[in-house]
A protein has these predicted regions:
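A short, proline-enriched helix->beta-strand linker immediately N-terminal to the Walker B motif
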Residues: 153-157
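Short coil-to-helix segment of the ABC ATPase nucleotide-binding domain corresponding to the Q-loop/switch region
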Residues: 94-101
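Conserved ABC ATPase signature
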Residues: 134-138, 142
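Helix-to-loop junction immediately C-terminal to a conserved catalytic motif
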Residues: 49
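Catalytic Walker B motif of ABC-type/P-loop ATPase nucleotide-binding domains
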Residues: 159-162
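Conserved ABC transporter NBD signature motif
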Residues: 57-65
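Helix N-cap at the start of a conserved alpha-helix in ABC-type nucleotide-binding domains
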Residues: 170-172
């Protein structure tokens, strides 16, 4: 499903983002990628979505070699990925329904299908009664649920979450983590980047730890992982 083979990435300023990284993630796995600031977590995500390319090595996503993909095929790659960010990135002037529907409108889905898919995903994330609300009327946890709904409305094969609980209180963070578990249980591969060790222990999933652009640990259960 996802594979990094000896991936090396250096930015123009000379900083090494990833150094000889090899990772294999099976279809349907839930994997946490952890590390301090500058460890290489953000670059890892950017490589998955072809936002950046490696200087050497191979990146496979959904059985596609994204290091060799044609630029015309990148939008099709990204349609199979759902991405959730720490800062939600909702459109403030659009309702909850419209924010989620936007992800389908850009791929020219039919209005009837859009309505059905959006209502279904709103029920999944527990926001059926918030469809007509604006983001400013929602709590932080509710805004993140909208962002998650938008990311999964097109049924991606892989859901990528970049510090999704970073702006949330502990209980809301656990609620959001439970939602990611439910999405994973439905068959979606989940890759979550986080530095929140409480969430790592709570989720109790496979943990890949990065430090200085290298994989320093790859453990099958988060409860056994402790940040130095």
């Amino acid at each position: 499903m996802i594979e990094f083979r000896n991936v090396h990435k250096v930015y123009d300023n000379g900083s090494i983002a990833l150094e000889d990284v090899s990772i294999h993630i099976e279809k349907g796995e839930f994997v946490l990628v952890c590390g301090h600031s500058g460890a290489g977590k953000s670059t890892f995500i950017k490589l998955l979505s072809h936002e950046v390319t490696p200087d050497s090595g191979t990146v496979i996503v959904n059985d596609v070699d994204v290091t060799r993909i044609k630029s015309s095929k990148v939008p099709y790659l990204r349609r199979k990925l759902g991405i959730v960010f720490q800062d939600f990135r909702l459109l403030p002037s659009k309702t909850v329904f419209e924010n989620i529907a936007f992800a389908l409108e850009v791929i020219e889905e039919k209005p009837k299908v859009i309505k059905e898919k959006v209502l279904n995903v709103l029920e999944l994330v527990g926001l059926s009664d918030k469809a007509n609300d604006l983001p400013q009327d929602l709590s932080g946890g509710e805004q993140q649920r909208v962002a998650i709904a938008r990311a999964i409305v097109n049924k991606p094969l892989v859901l990528i979450a970049d510090e999704p609980t970073g702006n949330l209180d502990p209980q809301t963070s656990r609620d959001i983590s439970d939602l990611f578990k439910a999405i994973n249980n439905s068959g979606t591969t989940v890759v979550m980047v986080t530095h929140d060790m409480d969430m790592v222990s709570y989720l109790n999933k496979r943990v890949i730890a990065l430090e200085g652009g290298r994989v320093v640990s790859d453990q099958m259960r988060g409860a056994a992982f402790h940040e130095n």
